[in-house]
Amino acid sequence: MKKIKIILIAAAFLCGANAYAQQDWNASFGYASTSFYGEDCSSFLSSHDLRGVYAGVRHEFYFSALAGLTFEPGLLFYYQSARSQTGGSPKYIKMHYLSVPLDVKYTFGVSGGTTGAFFTGPVLNVGVLGNLYESDKFVTNQDLLDPMHQLTRVNLQWGFGLAFTVADAVQVRASYSLGISRLIPERELHNNVLSVGVGLLF
C-alpha cells in the first residue's frame, strides 16, 4: 500500500510538471540604490549611496504540484555611481557588476488579470570591468593571479520582495537585498540594495 501511495505521489508530480511545461522569461530594467555600512566602511561609502540602473532577464520554472510556487533564477547587470559633494577624495566612484538572484516565488491572485507574488532567495554578485575598491579609490585589479584578491569582486546577499503582474504581460517589482561584501580587501562591509523595476513577460 505504501509503495502504491509513493508511486501515485510521484506520478502526480510528473504529470504536474508536464502539465506546466510553460516557462516564462522576464526582461526587466529599473532603478537601484546601494548603501554601505560597518566598522570597516570608508567615510565615503558610509555617507554616499550608490545609485544607478539595472537590466537583465529572469526565467521562471513552474511546479504545478505545488500550486503557486515557482523557482526564478536571473542574470542582471547593475551600474551604480556616487559623486562627492564636498570636494574630498575620491570625487567619484562607480560599480558595475553581474547579479544572479536565485528566488523562490509564491504567486497569488489579486483581481481580474492581476496577480501578486512574494519572492525570496540568495543573491550572488560578481564585479566586472576591473572595478575594485582599494585605498579610497576604485582601481583596476592588478593581482589577477591572486585568488584571495579576486574575492573582493564577489559578495553574497539575501533578497526578498514583492511583484505584481498585469495581463501576464507586464510586471512591476520591488526588492531589498541584505549582504556582506569584501569590496575593500581584508575588510568586511555590509551592503544593502533597494531595486524597483518593470519587467516584460514573453
Predicted features along the sequence, with ranges:
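Bacterial Sec-dependent N-terminal signal peptides
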Residues: 1-28, 198-202
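Short loop/turn motifs that connect adjacent beta-strands in outer-membrane beta-barrel proteins
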Residues: 19-23, 63-69, 109-115
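Residues that define the transmembrane beta-barrel architecture of outer-membrane proteins
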Residues: 23, 49-53, 94-100, 152-158, ...
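Repeated loop/turn-to-beta-strand initiation elements of outer-membrane beta-barrel proteins
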Residues: 25, 67-69, 112, 164, ...
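Transmembrane beta-strands of outer-membrane beta-barrel pores
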Residues: 31-35, 61, 77-81, 99, ...
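Flexible, solvent-exposed loop segments that connect beta-strands
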Residues: 36-47, 79-96, 128-152, 182-187, ...
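Outer-membrane beta-barrel architecture
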Residues: 56-60, 101-105, 161, 197-199
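Outer-membrane beta-barrel "beta-signal"
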Residues: 164, 190-202
